[in-house]
Amino acid sequence: MNNDEYLTALGQNAKQASYALATLSGQQKSALLRCIANKLTAAKDDIVAANQQDVADAKANGLSDAMIDRLLLDETRLMGVISDIDNVIGLTDPVGCEIDSRLLDNGLRLSRRRVPLGVIGVIYEARPNVTVDIAVLALKTGNAVILRGGKETLSSNKALCKVIRSAMVEQGLSEDCVQLIDNPDRALVSGLLKLDKYVDMIVPRGGQNLQRLCAEQATIPVILGGIGICHIYVDAAANLEKAVAVIENAKVQRPTVCNALDTVLVHASHAKAFIPVLAKHLSGLGVKFYGCEQTQAILGAEKIEVSAADDESYSTEWLSLTLGLKVVADLESAVEHIRTFSSGHSESILTDNIHTASEFMNAVDSAAVYVNASTRFTDGGEFGLGAEVAVSTQKLHARGPMGLEALTTYKWLAWGDYTVR
């Protein structure tokens, strides 16, 4: 079987499986998800062992620490993933919900109802937890899913999908509701992007190269996002003591994820007092800095190492303990910098001036905009959406963390009495 035949079979099987999924009741889907959670718990030793093999191979192949952190699925993280399944079970099922209805003058009773998309293709890199997160959200919303993870996570993904597929069969459903492309051949990615006869939406979760590939080659609607060049602006009216804690959380808590902080913009009135305090605190936590000329002069006087920032560094999603620092004259300058370099993911302002905060929120056009909060909150779980499929930085069909509703569409239902036009 060549690649085209293989992908066609995947697509046909997924489409066929999606029909039965779309008719499941909320209770049936909850029972399925509980079965998956129980089976994952029972198989945790095998799953962790498979992940340890992936991690060992990654280290042997010289992958970066950031990539290895994304790849890791130890027992603690796995149990967190399983706990998220319980959270999703508790969420309201959007499928079947009536969005609106009305009686038309012609006698038709017209309504709009949420329905599954059908088949979703997801392409992602070194994050095995995504395998479970996406499968669970897809099944909760009655969608079949075709998964293509990175070759670095192949052993982990095989172990996870084996368990999920066994749960499908146990619940009387086709195992093809969840399928994994387990061939690392990159040509299969391009083929999947053109499988528009069977796949209704593609979600790429990865870096700029993957996003660009999908945007250029897909004949299927694609949800772009996941690249987070995130900013925090420290305003003239900010509480500087509290600001340090927020910036630490946004940068240090988990620097390898897309909602981690990349650049801090500091109002000029605070530059000399605040930047040294912030840099000393963060450097003690292992953070390295790129700064504008003013920042370099301030930190140079304090004997704190800082590299020269430029457009390239401001355009970088660091995914590591590296931080850009820039002094700005005012709110307008901060907003202009964000408009120039942001990926449209998450931005925050730290200020006690409500009018400035409102101006910032209105002026910044990103998926999530915060006042006096860390960018780390841009997450499906934190937003109460359950585990997320992705964080979309586009405006159609979804924006920000994609929860259950983002995996549905709607159809028009019209009741008549043998009505003619």
Swiss-Prot record:
Keywords linked to the UniProt accession: Amino-acid biosynthesis, Cytoplasm, NADP, Oxidoreductase, Proline biosynthesis
Gene Ontology MF terms in the entry: glutamate-5-semialdehyde dehydrogenase activity; NADP binding
Pathway membership: Amino-acid biosynthesis; L-proline biosynthesis; L-glutamate 5-semialdehyde from L-glutamate: step 2/2
Catalytic activity: L-glutamate 5-semialdehyde + phosphate + NADP(+) = L-glutamyl 5-phosphate + NADPH + H(+)
Subcellular location: Cytoplasm
CC annotations in GO: cytoplasm
Gene3D superfamilies: Aldehyde Dehydrogenase, Chain A, domain 1, Aldehyde Dehydrogenase, Chain A, domain 2
Enzyme nomenclature, EC number: 1.2.1.41
Pfam family, one: Aldedh
Gene Ontology BP terms: L-proline biosynthetic process
Keyword Transport: no
Function: Catalyzes the NADPH-dependent reduction of L-glutamate 5-phosphate into L-glutamate 5-semialdehyde and phosphate. The product spontaneously undergoes cyclization to form 1-pyrroline-5-carboxylate.
HAMAP family: ProA
Assigned protein family: Belongs to the gamma-glutamyl phosphate reductase family.
Name the UniProt record assigns to this protein: Gamma-glutamyl phosphate reductase
Annotated source species: Shewanella pealeana (strain ATCC 700345 / ANG-SQ1)
Gene assigned in the entry: proA
